[in-house]
Amino acid sequence: MENDLVQLVAKLQRDPVFYFNNCLKIQEFGTGELIPFELNEVQGILHKMMQRQIDRDEHVRMIVLKARRFGISTYVQGRFFHHAAMNRNKVVQITTHSKAATDVMFNMARTMEQNLPKEIKPQMKYSGKREMHWGSDEGGLNSLYSLSTVGGREVRGSKVDFLHCSEVASWGHGGEEYLLGLLNCVVQGFKTEAIIESTAQGTGGVFHDMFWDAYSGDSGWEAVFFPWFMFSHYTKDFKNDDERKEFNAVLGTDDRYGGEEEAKLLGVSCEFDIGAEDPLRFEVTLENLNWRRQCIRTQCQNDLNKFHQEFPSTAREAFVSTGRGVFPREQLNEMVLDAEKLSREVPSEGFHIPIQAYKEGRTKEKYIIEAQDDGELQVWMRPNKQRDYRIGVDVAEGLDIGRDTDWSVAVVIDPHTFEEVAMLRCKIDPDLLAWQVASLGKWY
């Protein structure tokens, strides 16, 4: 019997999902009933992405842009609770944007702790308003599970193994400096984890910048966005085939639901590469759009923009819909959908523009462009000698230091169709950028 218990504890320690299902209780959304913590499809994908990253990099650095009620915070709470309650000398730090949110998070953790099976429930040394310390004067786990609100007590200089920063886009004035202090408490490697998650709050700000830096692969972080339509709860079945056909026939004709935008959503898809398996693919169905209409009517007070804010379809839509822009958001969102659709239908080619490849006395051409999949130049349409082109350039400082430096960008436009046919995006000295733009101009 004792040997069986040892084997069970070992499995619980090495298999977080087994631990979630058999040891943790959470409150079911809506009913408030305590239920076993079983991962939904979004949580399951995030879990596999994190496990893959920790196997590859010996740590997790993940930034998550989310829609409402996907259970991202619940998953991170459960993951970190498992780390602290099943391992010695671990420190968990969770920081939220408001005291109310901090209280909700801590109550979730306390519920997990209070309902643990007694056989694996660690001894509690201290439990305060926003802190649990497992251990005893004689030893024990000596693991700390602590929560705080941004702007609260200083944590700079502390050692943190697992950091969760919640709703970072809402951290407000001083939030970026506070975040920097927290991140510097987490060392690289050693299976440490730092997870930043938030709904969008417009363009600009530390969360927006960090997300896009990670998305482009320039920061050492991994970015992920979960669109609303991949969640199985966000569908509404039709009563019969006739109702489904009738719905399809009028799709995109009602301005309350976005008009043409609604029709363009049908078939929009996303994929998640979670390892050795084939990528998981999710696609907008008529059932998704049926639920979308109901949600706009009942949960968003017939306000389409509120739906965009709460349930974005793309990462760009998430940031655009929540900002205070000059241009109409509906049209911007429609343009985003058009661009996403076109990028799937006409993928870009990658190229590299060598800098100062030419020297006097060599036969090599002065201005050259070389094919390279991950190059700084994206090309959707190669030059057509029968056309003229225009190049617009936005020159940045050029220094490739840190995530706060801007990108220099050159965009090639076909003035006859107003299409963007190529884009150069890089961080180099402005003089060297001029060489690249000259090469681009020679090509076009």
Regions found by a protein language model. Give the residues of each.
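Conserved Walker A/P-loop ATP-binding site and its immediately adjacent core
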Residues: 90-111
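RNase H-like, metal-dependent nuclease domains and their acidic two-metal-ion catalytic environment used
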Residues: 61, 77, 81, 95, ...
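A short beta-strand-to-loop transition that corresponds to the Sensor-1 phosphate-sensing loop
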Residues: 98, 148-150, 197-202, 228-230
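Walker A/P-loop
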Residues: 56-80
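Long, charged, glycine-rich C-terminal linkers/tails
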Residues: 120-136
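Short, conserved loop/helix-junction motifs that constitute active-site signature segments
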Residues: 185-190
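Post-Walker A helix-loop "phosphate-sensing" segment adjacent to the P-loop in P-loop NTPases
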Residues: 83-90
